[in-house]
């Protein structure tokens, strides 16, 4: 990862999650990742896309964390993005975020919250592994 956002993010990831196996990957597409807690969930990967951070959960889904206010000074935007990603990762590692996938569709929401829609053959996961199917999923 390059740039100040990446540098700040990496330092915060190392400090907040010292025992999670953080990996830093340099190269053409620099990235930070955490190894999977369960093979069906896969690794979490964080990409610095310049003015946003993208989080991918293996092949299940991905999402973008963008600045809430693009008019803020760069340092404030970066701090806000990093803190939101830190809170999200804490919730993920605490199994408080539910990931789902159905064919080529996927997403996440807070555990216990109702998903935006219902898809046939939807599979659900938390960081520690798969969740049982609900009646509404069949």
Regions found by a protein language model. Give the residues of each.
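N-terminal "first-domain core" detector
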Residues: 1-39
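Acidic, proline/glycine-rich low-complexity IDRs
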Residues: 3, 11-15, 76-83, 87-138
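Hydrophobic beta-strand residues in large extracellular and virion-surface proteins
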Residues: 9, 13, 32, 44-46, ...
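Short linear motifs in intrinsically disordered
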Residues: 22-23, 43-47, 96-104
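Generic recognition of long tandem-repeat/solenoid scaffolds
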Residues: 28-37, 53-58, 105-117
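Intrinsically disordered, low-complexity regulatory segments enriched in Ser/Thr/Pro
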Residues: 39-80, 121-138
């Amino acid at each position: 990862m390059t740039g100040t956002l990446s540098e700040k993010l990496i330092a915060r990831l190392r400090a907040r999650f010292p025992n999670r196996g953080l990996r830093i990957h340099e190269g053409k597409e620099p990235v930070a990742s955490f190894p999977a807690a369960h093979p069906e969930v896969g690794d979490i990967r964080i990409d610095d896309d310049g003015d946003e951070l993208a989080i991918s959960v293996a092949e299940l889904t991905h999402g973008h964390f963008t600045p809430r206010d693009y008019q803020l000074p760069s340092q404030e935007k970066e701090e806000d993005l990093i803190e939101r990603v830190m809170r999200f990762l804490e919730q993920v590692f605490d199994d408080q975020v539910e990931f789902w996938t159905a064919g080529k569709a996927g997403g996440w929401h807070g555990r216990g919250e109702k998903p935006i829609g219902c898809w046939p053959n939807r599979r659900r996961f938390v960081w520690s592994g798969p969740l049982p199917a609900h009646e509404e999923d069949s």
